[in-house]
């Protein structure tokens, strides 16, 4: 009897991953953590682990070369790769890079791309140690594998959040998404007008940098360790705050309350959102690609977190039965919903 057809959109990104990997079970004792977290953790010695992550980026889905400079793209690829390692509270050390190269690309384009890769590697202190190249008939394809190390006792998984833990966030949200929307707007406006007209980016340079050249928060791993803080759970913001909170809740079997008035938004984010008639809260919740860190810590560490001065406490963990919700200033709650990848949204995420 023939199998029925199930559309990928019916499952969504996270449902698809669960579906494809449900039958896989770890067989090796050296596998500490497999599918289901930001990265895999593999035993390296009695007290240390190697952390490994891989990511793919496809032209026309994850980036548009009509407005993405190759140097910035190379930088962003490294950020995307090592951010998953950082989200495990590990220190990134090496990357490998494999490319599918279309005939429309030139050697000069690739030189610029690798210049961006080199700059990001130097900045983060990681080594490019290998990779592969192949021809592509579907545009530029990029795959990065990032490797890091950490003590087993210092790794933060998505599954460790406990009721009453504080929910903490580095940086601000929504800036990358608004940078993307700005680029898309100017591209549409300028189509067919020729090179004599320049795009209007003045006043929104920060948003462009957050989208085109984001920086992984590897600095926070060192800051947390200096304070003796090991997050009970952690994840990086790649699919938007709502998706990441729900991922922690799912893995930790808990609920969450995020307070709207505590969500950090940059001035340029709110200004452009108002100009484009976009709710900045939606940009923060579902925009993604901020590459900030969302993590939880026990309530008794509140003073240490506050003293760091670069982290916002935006909510707390609750019982699983309460679900995950956004709390508005008047005290009402709105259930959080994940965005993630679907074929309909792939070109704008």
List the predicted regions and their residue ranges.
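Glycine-rich anion/phosphate-binding loops
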Residues: 33, 66-82, 104-115, 153
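Small-aliphatic-rich amphipathic alpha-helix that forms the alpha element of a beta-alpha
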Residues: 70-94, 115-123, 223, 243-248
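Glycine-rich anion-binding loops of enzyme active sites
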Residues: 57, 93-186, 316
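Glycine-/charge-enriched secondary-structure boundary and capping motifs
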Residues: 2-15, 19-25, 48, 102-127, ...
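Polyanion-binding loop/helix "lid" in catalytic or ligand-binding cores
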Residues: 196-247
């Amino acid at each position: 009897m023939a199998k029925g057809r199930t559309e990928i959109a019916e499952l969504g990104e996270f449902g698809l991953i669960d579906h494809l990997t449900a039958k896989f079970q770890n067989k090796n004792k050296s596998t500490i953590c497999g599918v289901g977290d930001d990265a895999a953790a593999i035993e390296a010695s009695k007290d240390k682990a190697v952390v490994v992550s891989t990511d793919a980026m496809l032209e026309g889905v994850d980036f548009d070369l009509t407005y993405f400079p190759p140097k910035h793209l190379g930088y962003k690829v490294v950020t995307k790769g090592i951010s998953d390692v950082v989200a495990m509270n590990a220190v990134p050390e090496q990357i490998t890079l494999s490319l599918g190269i279309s005939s429309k690309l030139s050697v000069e384009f690739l030189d610029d791309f690798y210049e961006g890769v080199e700059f990001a590697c130097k900045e983060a202190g990681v080594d490019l140690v290998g990779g592969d190249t192949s021809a592509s008939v579907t545009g530029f394809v990029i795959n990065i594998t990032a490797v890091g190390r950490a003590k087993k006792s210092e790794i933060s998984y998505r599954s460790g959040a406990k009721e009453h833990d504080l929910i903490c966030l580095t940086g601000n949200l929504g800036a990358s998404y608004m940078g993307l929307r700005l680029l898309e707007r100017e591209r549409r406006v300028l189509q067919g007008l020729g090179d004599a007209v320049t795009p209007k980016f003045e006043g929104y340079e920060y948003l462009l940098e957050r989208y085109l050249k984001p920086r992984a928060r590897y600095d926070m791993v060192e800051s947390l360790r200096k304070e003796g803080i090991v997050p009970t759970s952690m994840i990086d913001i790649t699919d938007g705050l709502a998706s990441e909170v729900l991922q922690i809740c799912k893995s930790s079997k808990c609920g969450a309350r995020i307070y709207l008035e505590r969500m950090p938004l940059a001035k340029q984010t709110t200004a452009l959102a108002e100009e484009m008639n976009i709710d900045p809260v939606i940009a923060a919740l579902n925009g993604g690609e901020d590459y900030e860190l969302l993590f939880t810590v026990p309530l008794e560490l509140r003073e240490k977190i506050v003293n760091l001065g670069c982290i916002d406490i935006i909510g707390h963990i609750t019982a699983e039965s309460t679900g995950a919700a956004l709390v508005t200033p008047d005290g009402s709650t709105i259930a959080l919903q994940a965005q993630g990848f679907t074929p309909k949204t792939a070109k704008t995420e």
